[in-house]
């Protein structure tokens, strides 16, 4: 299963950027209160709806330099960090670019060195620690198969939401072209 990830935050940043889905522009949401930094490029999988009501989150492992906010990367999942925060389910799909042969050996979560998994776990366990009202309440790793199932389920939630939006707006899935018809 391949998908596009929109990068919001490059690896090494303490700034938390978010795409404003209405304008398409990138907004600085906040600077992390802790001294931690993002362990991989971080963003979301396009055309998905996660359990938290936002697009499904993704971390992209790269062999070279970090990318930049707004960069689109074609990826495949190798696993997922199932996480619950103060607002509920907040899963993070761990993926690699489909175009990088240096990462071809990473096919499932167990192919990633355990220290790399621990580094990612540590980040998500502490990155909200100093923020009032925010917390991480539980998390565990699952493999590629579970990650791909969640990507598919999130795509279905996204499609259902947009079908409901079309019905409520009277469009019924049709796009008006303008003018007298």
Range-by-range predicted roles:
Residues 1-165, 170-180:
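Hydrophobic N-terminal alpha-helices or hydrophobic patches in metabolic proteins across all domains
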């Amino acid at each position: 299963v391949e998908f596009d990830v929109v990068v919001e935050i490059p690896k090494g940043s303490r700034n938390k950027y978010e795409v404003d889905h209405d304008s398409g522009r990138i907004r600085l949401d906040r600077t992390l209160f802790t001294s931690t930094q993002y362990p991989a490029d971080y963003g979301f999988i396009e055309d998905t709806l996660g359990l938290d009501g936002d697009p499904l989150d993704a971390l992209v492992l790269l062999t070279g330099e970090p990318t930049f906010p707004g960069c689109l990367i074609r990826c495949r999942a190798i696993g997922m960090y199932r996480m619950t925060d103060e607002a509920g389910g907040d899963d993070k799909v761990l993926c690699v670019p489909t175009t990088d042969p240096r990462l071809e050996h990473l096919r499932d979560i167990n192919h990633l060195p355990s220290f790399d998994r621990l580094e990612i776990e540590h980040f998500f366990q502490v990155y909200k620690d100093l923020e009032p009202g925010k917390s991480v309440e539980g998390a565990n790793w699952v493999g590629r198969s579970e990650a791909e199932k969640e990507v598919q389920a999130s795509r279905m939630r996204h499609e259902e939401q947009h079908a409901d939006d079309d019905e409520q707006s009277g469009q019924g899935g049709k796009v008006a072209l303008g003018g007298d018809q």
